[in-house]
Amino acid sequence: MSRSTYSLEQLADFLKVEFQGNGATLLSGVEEIEEAKTAHITFLDNEKYAKHLKSSEAGAIIISRTQFQKYRDLNKNFLITSESPSLVFQKCLELFITPVDSGFPGIHPTAVIHPTAIIEDHVCIEPYAVVCQHAHVGSACHIGSGSVIGAYSTVGQHSYIHPRVVIRERVSIGKRVIIQPGAVIGSCGFGYVTSAFGQHKHLKHLGKVIIEDDVEIGANTTIDRGRFKHSVVREGSKIDNLVQIAHQVEVGQHSMIVAQAGIAGSTKIGNHVIIGGQAGITGHICIADHVIMMAQTGVTKSITSPGIYGGAPARPYQEIHRQVAKVRNLPRLEERIAALEKLVQKLEALSEQH
């Protein structure tokens, strides 16, 4: 049996979960539930895909305890978890999937590193990357091809900076941070003052950008530095592709921002906030902890209570739901009003006759 082949029983032991079925079943790969074959392990998380359970050829299926009670009679090999099946499946990837390496170990000779920069042990710096003066790259970091680490910036241990990322001067990147290609961290904010002659003069931005530990930043996302105060993304937050975070914004711990969202300057986002795709948030407001914004939400004032919000301007989801229901009934209301108008006209005609 190869290192990448495991029995169902071995996998259950590794994942610390229970199993039902033939413990000797051999598994050597992972696949989504519709495509999985007898040597594959898969998972069911979203009930929309439960329709594929009966026909699935997967050698083993990771499901929750609640799902197991519903589907235990299907005579399948099940791994039963109290956690999210998707999270447990992710652990399987550590066994079956070998990460793709760039093929450039160590520091490539074309990398440009300033003599005052500090590079700790076990760092990989790929071709044509630039590390500027007094920058500090922590141990076991990976700096991708063409990326720039600006002057006086720091990159914490075990962080992975993908190709063509720009980290400007005086930026602080925490430990285990992942930044995808094309992201720009620390550009000057969009701050201007208009002169008496109508000319827009750019203001100097002296603040820093601070990215705390375990943050992930998507491709082509931009996080601007503040004019005086710092722009901050707190521990564990995840930011999707094409997100704009303006100057002096603070994003709380373990929040999630989906693609094409934009946050204007000096706004403070709480902890465990979810911001849907293409949402827009105005500047100088606060968003409470545990707020969820639906896609394309337009936020024009502070949100002080947890809950689900949507629409433009943003309002509680229940209110939107009621409004949508009323709009759906408008055709019937129109018919009733037309009927009432006809009735009134008849009554008026009768009144005139008498």
Curated annotation (Swiss-Prot):
Function field: Catalyzes the N-acylation of UDP-3-O-acylglucosamine using 3-hydroxyacyl-ACP as the acyl donor. Is involved in the biosynthesis of lipid A, a phosphorylated glycolipid that anchors the lipopolysaccharide to the outer membrane of the cell.
Cross-referenced HAMAP family: LpxD
Active site: residue positions: H247
Annotated GO CC locations: membrane
Alphabetical GO biological process terms: lipid A biosynthetic process
Molecular functions per Gene Ontology: N-acyltransferase activity
InterPro entries: Hexapep (IPR001451), LpxD (IPR007691), Trimer_LpxA-like_sf (IPR011004), UDP_GlcNAc_AcTrfase_non-rep (IPR020573)
The keyword Chaperone is assigned to this record: no
One Pfam match: LpxD
Family in the record: Belongs to the transferase hexapeptide repeat family. LpxD subfamily.
EC number(s) stated in the UniProt entry for this protein: 2.3.1.191
Keyword set, alphabetical order: Acyltransferase, Lipid A biosynthesis, Lipid biosynthesis, Lipid metabolism, Repeat, Transferase
Lineage, highest ranks first: Bacteria, Pseudomonadati, Chlamydiota, Chlamydiia, Chlamydiales
Protein name: UDP-3-O-acylglucosamine N-acyltransferase
Catalytic activity as recorded in UniProt: a UDP-3-O-[(3R)-3-hydroxyacyl]-alpha-D-glucosamine + a (3R)-hydroxyacyl-[ACP] = a UDP-2-N,3-O-bis[(3R)-3-hydroxyacyl]-alpha-D-glucosamine + holo-[ACP] + H(+)
Database matches in CDD domains: LbH_LpxD (cd03352)
Entry keyword Transferase: yes
NCBIfam families: lipid_A_lpxD (TIGR01853), PRK00892.1 (NF002060)
Subunit structure: Homotrimer.
Pathway entry: Bacterial outer membrane biogenesis; LPS lipid A biosynthesis
